From Swiss-Prot:
Glycans are attached at residues 59, 213. One of its GO terms (cellular component) is plasma membrane. This is MFS-type transporter phiL. It comes from Talaromyces stipitatus (strain ATCC 10500 / CBS 375.48 / QM 6759 / NRRL 1006) (Penicillium stipitatum). Belongs to the major facilitator superfamily. CAR1 family. Pfam families: MFS_1. Disulfide bonds: none annotated. Phomoidrides A and B (also known as CP-225,917 and CP-263,114) are potent inhibitors of Ras farnesyltransferase and squalene synthase. CP-225,917 and CP-263,114 inhibit Ras farnesyl transferase from rat brain with IC(50) values of 6 uM and 20 uoM, respectively. CP-225,917 inhibits squalene synthase with an IC(50) value of 43 uM and CP-263,114 with an IC(50) of 160 uM. It is a multi-pass membrane protein. SUPFAM superfamilies: MFS general substrate transporter. MFS-type transporter; part of the gene cluster that mediates the biosynthesis of the antihypercholesterolemic agents phomoidrides which are dimeric anhydrides. The chain crosses the membrane at residues 27-47, 64-84, 97-117, 155-175, 183-203, 265-285, 311-331, 370-390, 391-411, 442-462, 463-483.
Amino acid sequence: MTASEQTALLGSPRKPAYTIFSNSQKLLIILTATLASVFSPLSANIYYPALKSIQKELNVSEEILNMTITSYMIFQGLSPTFIGSLSDTIGRRPVYIICFLIYIAANVGLTFQTTFIGLLLLRCLQSSGSSSTVNLAYGVTADVVTSAERGRYVGLASVGPIIGPTLGPVLGGIISQYYGWRFIFVVLTGMALIMLIFIIVFLPETCRNIVGNGSLEPLSVWNKPLSSFLCKKKENEDLDETLEAQQAIEAARKKGGKPKPWKSLTLLFTYPTGCVILFNGFTFATYYAVTTSLTWCFSSTYHFNEVEIGLSYIPIGVGSMIAAFTNGFLLDWNYRRAVKKVLGRPLARGEHFDHDTGVALGFHIERTRLQIVIPAVVLAMLAMVAYGWSVYLVLTPAVPLVLLFLFGWLGTAAYSGMNVLIVDLNLKSPATATAANNLIRCMLGALGAMVIMPIINAVGMGWTFIMISGVWIVLSPLIILVAWSKSSE
């Protein structure tokens, strides 16, 4: 962790607050970022129930139409690679505005297009606009919260990408059935307009390269919420920064420099971040393989109709949402326990702990986070294998549905825990690091979605998920090495 998160050690001078935002302000900021991050996965999944209708109207084959899904995921991985670095340089607000303007324009075009080529290109544009909102949410979270509270707040930020796949198929099916598939994009346009207006009016700039801990006035009008022009900013009487601290923040602002989109790619080859990103990407790919195969498996094995299949996504979605909330508190509890062990006292509320100082005392952020992640991975693996065999043996539907709930809970706990660690390891450029994570996540997820059904058709559900577990085990030394080697921050 960088020196921006300082610990109030005995006898040390008073340090500036990590952020001037109150707890309620931080919660509102992160909730806004979370809602914005819903659009990328929602746009991907709301589209699925309408595929048959679109295929009939555009008169294309299923294989050709599936190109719109593959291309969406490719741009979902590539776009944040460039946008993440841009947001670390020019700020979160301008990038949010750019992304939503692109997204709204794409949805308007999708509403009126009449050709497959138009659909394909506009889906790529739609993905480019919405996909960066996910890593922006993690970037905003890292801007305003410290490591001691990052677990629960990053858990909250991860709710958006979880809600989208859960609600998308249900909402898309209802809209497509009663209003036609084009109205899906009308609804998305309206939702995006409301979100954009809220961001323009209320969301403050949080990027630490622009506003430091929030106390600096942004230089650009695009970094200022409209509300700041309507009411005078309240002075923070508790803020007593020294001249040295203020100069450090100003220097951080000037160091923003030019965007470096290639930095996301270099992180993939950086230890330990690269190891965590690769293992995390496969964890997500496994999750995506399970959800992608769910429709076919339940329709062929249990003869579920479209409504029943849509409802079958609810258990894994609910499990994922529970993990997003509960795992954050567990991560924070374990963090405070580890810090107390090396300091000999508990962290005071709002106290910031310097990880660089902690290393000399025997504290390792990688090990602290992965102590929660590794057990979750093992249990998720067992739940996934049990789910595969329960469907293969045609047990009562309640059994695989319960196992889907457990897999959603445990898999998301592992995934979100590694997301927190990736942010911890890259506090100077959290959005860039999350973009690298997103790139691998989407590419491996697309690969998992592409190969899962051919493998199931070849060897069956049970053996398919045993094979996936085998790959998971082969990759496990990556994460074990990070957890029990010397800290490399």
